Amino acid sequence: QHDPLKLTEKDDRLYGLGSTDMKGFFAVIYAALEPLLRQELKFKQPLIILATADEESSMNGARTLAKLGKPKARYAVIGEPTGLKPINMHKSIMMETIRIQGQSGHSSNPALGKNALEAMHEVISALLNFTQQLQADYQNPHFAVDIPTMNLGVIHGGDNPNRICGHCELEFDVRLLPGMANDSIRESISKLVKPIASKYQTKISLTSLFPGVEAFENQ
C-alpha cells in the first residue's frame, strides 16, 4: 500500500522501511536529545549515537566496530523495538547456499542427464525433515517464535522445459536458539546432502552467504 523507500504519514502512523525498527529509533533519540541541546547543557561524558551498516544481515558495521574496539562506553541503549522490555538473548542468523551441479541434456531421454532439480527436490525434503526434528528437540519459551526456524527463500534452476536441468541453487536462512551452534548445523546439513549427491550422481556444495551471527544469551 505504501512505497517502502518513502516515509508516508497516514492516520497518525508513519509507514516506511524500518520505521518501527532502527530508523524509528533514530527519530526517537533525536527528538529526545533536541531539548537538551537547545539548553546547551554540558554532558559530563560523551553521548554517542551509533549507526551500523548491514544490521539485517552480515552485521559488517558492528563487526568492524567490535574489531576496532570502538567506541568505548559504560552503558548502551539498543534501539530495537522491544516495547521497553529488557531483552538478554537473541537467535542466531545463518544464510546459506546449496548448489547442485548435474548434467544437462535433451528432455527426450532424461536418463542421459543428471537432473539437478530432482536432486534438489530431495535436498529440500531432507531440510524440511531436519528442521522438524530440530523444532522437536529445541524450544525456548522466552522467544515469541520459540523454536529454531529455517526459511527456504530463493531457488533457481533450469532454463527450458525441454532441457534436463544441469544446475540448481537454493538459498535459505536458519535462526537458532541460544545453546545451538551455527557450525554444528552446517555440518549436519552437509552430512544430509552427501548421500543425495551420490544417489543422483551430482556434485553438491554448501556455502555461506556471509559468516553468520551466533545465538546469544546474557545471564
Cite the ranges covered by each PLM segment.
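Structural signature of FAD isoalloxazine-binding scaffolds in flavoprotein oxidoreductases
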Residues: 1, 78, 167
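Short active-site-adjacent structural elements
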Residues: 1, 86, 217
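Soluble metallo-hydrolase cores and metallopeptidase-like ectodomains found primarily
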Residues: 1-8
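Conserved beta-strand positions that form and line the central face of beta-propeller blades
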Residues: 6, 13, 154
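Conserved hydrophobic/aromatic pocket- or pore-lining residues that grip, position, or stack substrates
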Residues: 7, 49, 172
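Fold-level recognition of mixed alpha/beta catalytic cores in primary-metabolism enzymes, strongest
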Residues: 10-14, 19-129, 146
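Metal-dependent amide/peptide-bond hydrolase catalytic core
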Residues: 95-219
